[in-house]
Amino acid sequence: MKNFLFFLACCLLSTGAFAHLGNLAGTVYDQTTNQPIRGVTVQITGLNRATTTNELGQYRFVGLVAAPYKIELSHLGFATQLINVIVQDDQTATVRTVLTTAPVELGEVTISSGRAHDQQLISNLDIKLRPITNSQEVLRLVPGLFIGQHAGGGKAEQLFLRGFDLDHGTDIQLTVDGMPINMVSHAHGQGYADLHFVIPELIEGVDFKKRPYNAEKGNLATAGWVNFRTRTALDRSFVKLEGGQFDTFQAVAGLDLLGEKGGTASRNRKNQSAYLASEYSFTNSYFDNPQHFNRLNVMGKYHGHIGANTNLTLTGSTFWSKWNHSGQIPDRAIESGLTGFFGSVDPTEGGETSRTNFNAQFVTVTPRNNLIKNQVFYGNYGFELYSNFTFFLRDSINGDQIRQKERRNLFGYNGSYITESTIGKTHFTTTLGAQYRQDITGGKNGATPTELSYTRNRTETLERAKYGNINEINAALYADELVELSDRFTVNAGVRVDYFRSQYTDLLLQPAQTGRARQAIVSPKLNLYYTLNPRVQLYLNTCKGFHSNDARVVVPQGEPLRRTREILPGAYGSDLGVIFKPFPRLIVNAAAWYLWLAQEFVYVGDEGVVELSGKSRREGVDLSVRYQLTKTLYFDLDLNTANPRSIGDKIG
């Protein structure tokens, strides 16, 4: 009994001691737009404690001994600011800071254990420095990712990363402000991702990671994921006109709708902002058969603060594009004089696509400083593409032109709850999340079936190879725990559970037949970060990822695929790397990686057939270097190697 009373007294004394600690809370704003800034690095100098601001520009330190502190705030494109703060017992010191824009300085980049899980130093730097003329080109900012266009500028680009031919997005998850770009069970191919509906001048930042080491990232993130963040507000209205050869011109305009009328909720803070932007492009290009390429984009965005700790963001956009393209031509066709180098075998190739989006995001900080995010999105998407890859191989009379067509509705929800706590010197960040997405083609809601047909000159349908309605659901729950065990060592563990239901109605059968396939998958994650000093950080990332298969594969093959788990083939991988900053103006990021992918069945959208893709193994090394030579001159280097191998196949 005496021992118990002694233990209880010690607990009460320790609790009392902790109760006399103080806290520090602050908010950071952009001087130009008067809007909060997310991702600002906030460090307490001398303590090696750091954090980053959230979506509301807020940060918080808890459990500080009563004393004066010097706080350093830094962010790319802004001048670093030092402030002095006095923390008192049992009180929370509040700070409001305004950052001013400044030329990009590599010296502003910090390596911190407090932001280990979301450090993307290379990407954040590149987006500030490189000129961008096309939204798809932004993907090149991801070191090791490159793109290729082979269908006239209107079709989504071909993507390649870490030994993957990603086709048009099969193994990379792309989002804009959290809204999905990839189209599952698409008429052209699984995961098709057309980013052309994003106006490049409105891109504020790019978040990315190779492999889905975050529990938040699920389907299609086998090789990696990229999220584009559009600007919350315009600092000024703008107009840009460009012109060039071959009847090429482009016009881009952005209009700040509220300006100073946005109201002031508090000093240095706008209550709301809104803008409208549009882009139009046209070119005939240099081919013998004019492209007649047209693209129109319109986007509007509203951002408002509902109270001091809540904001609402509404985004609407619409996109339309139409074009002709010359297609591929064989060398012998040029050598024989059948067509010129800039000619075409089938001059009727081309396409038309459109997309309309609505995105609503609601972010709030509770009285206990927990962060709640809610997002709902809706998209209406249309696609019609005419291609001819084999000319007259299949049909020597009419040719081999195909039409891939669909119109779909997609909608979904992303939600998360983030809470932070401290036990002794250990800091915990807990995230719980839920996601839902549904894609529907055909039906009674203005959508048309997913189609693959053989055609002639775009005008005549010769035969339908695939024609049916797709209804696909992906629901997921995830949990993520980030534990800062010390000022140097951080552990992140997470788990994700995904459920898929694929439904396909084959309209070529009489009567039409509907089939369904269901499957769930569990994806664990484990990441370790060790910061040797403010210049060196080591990390080990491990995870399981996956991508779903096309509904036209999993429904007909159904039960056999479910038993062998090939509806959702798993991908296991790891990264071992270092972020190194030997000098203020030099950053080096190097990593060795490994990836193993399970056997799967792949739907070939151009032929309407199913191909067996066996197990595979990939390994390689990534190296990225950024060096600032002068205030206005920068050097960058990306070296990436990949060694993909098929497992189990005979050599040759």
At which residue positions do the language-model features occur?
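Short acidic/polar hinge/loop motifs at secondary-structure boundaries
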Residues: 62, 179-210, 228-229, 300
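Gram-negative outer-membrane beta-barrel transporters
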Residues: 417-418, 591-596, 612-652
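Transmembrane beta-barrel wall of Gram-negative outer-membrane proteins
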Residues: 245-282, 287-326, 350-370, 424
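Face-selective signature of the C-terminal outer-membrane beta-barrel domain
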Residues: 305-320, 351-507, 586-592, 636
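Extracytoplasmic beta-strand/coil segments of soluble accessory domains associated
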Residues: 136-183
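Structural signature of Gram-negative outer-membrane beta-barrels, strongest in the C-terminal barrel
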Residues: 307, 426-431, 435-437, 468-597, ...
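Short, acidic, small-residue-rich periplasmic hinge/interaction motif at the N-terminus
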Residues: 29, 33, 41-45, 74-78, ...
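Short strand-turn segments of transmembrane beta-barrel domains in outer membranes
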Residues: 207-215, 224-259, 278, 575
